[in-house]
Structure formats: structure tokens, C-alpha cells
Amino acid sequence: MKRLENKIAVITGGADGLGRAASIKFTAEGATVLIWDMNEEKGLLTVAEIEKEGGKVFFVKVNTASYNEVEAATQAAVEKFGRIDILINNAGITRDASIRKMTPDQWQQVIDVNLTGVFNCAKCISAGMVEKGYGRIINTSSVVALYGNFGQTNYVATKAGVIGITKTLARELGRKGVTVNAVAPGFIATEMVKKMPENILKSMEEKVPLGRLGMPEEIASAYLFLASDEAAYINGATLSVDGGIVN
């Protein structure tokens, strides 16, 4: 039997990068996946790729920074499928600048998507999970939440906040049958990262004890584990998937 057979999963930011890898892996393991993303073009390409392999997947254009949009998308999903079993809070953006140059808009944009978006999705979707007595919520943090990073005050603040949200929701929802955990990726070879100059990529690899960048599929595997029954007794944890950067 597949590990997520008959499960209904929402993956935010599922059109590209880590979310795309998770969407592919989750459908391969039997889940019906709802991709919530703003990028319709890439979302539909991911849907077509998954459907070609026989997976069950749907694209929904949702701005997770908008509570009203998340609430409406949640209601539509529950009306169609009866429930949502798994939430992967993966959507995120960057607006990098040093604190001296960072604008209030750059700060707020990242807060809205990376932190408020996690709250919006967790609040709307967890209500149904509590009612059913079952749920898995996995939030995407980052290793930079644990050690900081130059030029990313906004991003680091959100990813540290995600860990705090994760620990708090784990306490609030655990007794209701809902586990809440986080994954903190390190340097991952997404399409965007692979376009960086060779010297930058080399310096990133040198910081990793394993000597290489991670693959999106390796982060998706961490999501899959935490969403599966094998992780039923893991709650409030942050799993670093970083090749040993944080140890």
C-alpha cells in the first residue's frame, strides 16, 4: 500500500521548486494533491506532468497572504473532497537587502507570504482536521532561522517565526490528533539556485559537510516522512535537511 493512499493534501507553493517536488512525490505515494500557488503557468505544467504519470492533482490559484482567499479555497476543498488531511506550508518569497537598504515594503511582503500565509493556512485548515481528529501540518522553515544570514533580516525573521508557530501549534493541536512539524532546508539545488555563478555555487558547497547541495526531492522526502503514519509520534519538531550545516 502506498504511504499516503487516499489522503487529501494541500501544498502551498506547489507549482515550482520544493513544492513541485513534493507534489510529484505525494501523488506518487497515493495522495490527491491540491497545489495552491499564484503561478498558474508553472502550476498547470506541474499538473500536466503529474497527470501524465497517473497522479491525482488540482491547481488552485491562491494568494496565501490573503485570509479571505485561503478561507474560500479551504471551503471549496472540503466541499469537493470532504476533508483535508495534510497541509504543507511551503510557499515563500525573498526580498533580500541589508537592513540599511531594506524598505518597509520589502519587509512586509516577505512577512505577508512567509509568516502570515502560514497562519492563514494553518488556521483555516486545522479546524477541519480537529473536527475529524486527524491531521498533519508541515511548515517550511530554513537553516538560516537557526544561524541568521546577511541581507535577509525579513526572511530570517519569518523562518524563525515559523519554528515558533510550529512549536505552539503542536501544543495546541496535538491532543486533537493533529501533528505539527517543520522542515528546515539548507542549500538546495532548485532551478533558481542552479543559475547562480559557479563561484557562488562552489562556496555554498564548501559550507556543507557532505560537500554538495541538496536536491528538491530530498526535502520532499522529509515532507513525506512527516506526513506519513511512520511519523505519528513526532510533534513540534524541526527537521534540518542541510547536509550537516547545522549540527
Spans of model-derived segments:
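Canonical Rossmann dinucleotide-binding motif of NAD(H)/NADP(H)-dependent dehydrogenases/reductases
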Residues: 3-34
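Alpha-helical segment proximal to the catalytic Tyr-Lys
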Residues: 127, 171-175, 232
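Substrate-binding pocket helix/loop in short-chain dehydrogenase/reductase
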Residues: 98-99, 106-111, 193, 200, ...
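C-terminal substrate-recognition "lid" of short-chain dehydrogenase/reductases
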Residues: 81, 122, 130, 134, ...
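Active-site helix of classical SDR
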Residues: 122, 158, 166
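Catalytic Tyr-X3-Lys loop
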Residues: 93, 100-119, 134, 138, ...
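Residue(s) in the substrate-gating loop at a strand-loop-helix junction
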Residues: 142
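The beta1-alpha1 cofactor-binding region of Rossmann-like NAD(H)/NADP(H)-dependent oxidoreductases
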Residues: 40-41, 61-72, 104, 217-218
